[in-house]
Amino acid sequence: MQVTYGKGFDVAPMSNRVQALQDAMFAHVTPIELDTKHRFHGGMYLREVFRPADCIIVGKVHKKEHFYIVLSGTVVITTDEGAMEVTGPHIFESKPGAKRAVYAKTDAVCMTIHRVDSTTVEEVEEELVENDPDCVYLPGNKLSGKALT
């Protein structure tokens, strides 16, 4: 496992930097639909996402603690401590308020694991993440109509 920590990042402005990246991407990048698998079991929700190489994804703000796992591949990911390059497998413990940007240097598979009360993808989206009216993804990582315009 290889981990490289970025230097010169302040904890507070990281979410602002990720939001600025999302705003810039919305104007200049064509979104892709992500191969996403959803599993519910015993009050837990697991989301597994395949990220093709040279792809950058900006997620929504998470409301609850959860695990974020890089199963395979190499990604550069933003955390509260800054940007870091990780080759999977690697496990992060994410706090409420986390908003990540993830750049896949290689094909990568990442997953999140959450404790939930919900039993559907639509319900879990409402339970786990803040509403983002600018997001081009519907629950389950399906592209919305605005992504295609």
What are the roles of these predicted feature ranges?
Residues 1-48, 128-131, 139-149:
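A short, N-terminal "cap"/entry segment at the start of jelly-roll beta-barrel domains
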Residues 42-62:
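Conserved short histidine dyad/triad with adjacent acidic residue
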Residues 55, 63-64, 82, 98, ...:
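A generic "binding-loop/recognition-motif" signal
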Residues 63-81:
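Glycine- and acidic-residue-biased ligand/ion/polar-headgroup-sensing regions
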Residues 71-72, 88, 106:
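A cytosolic small-molecule/anion-sensing beta-strand core signal
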Residues 79-99:
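Short acidic-glycine-tyrosine-enriched beta hairpin
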Residues 105-149:
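Double-stranded beta-helix
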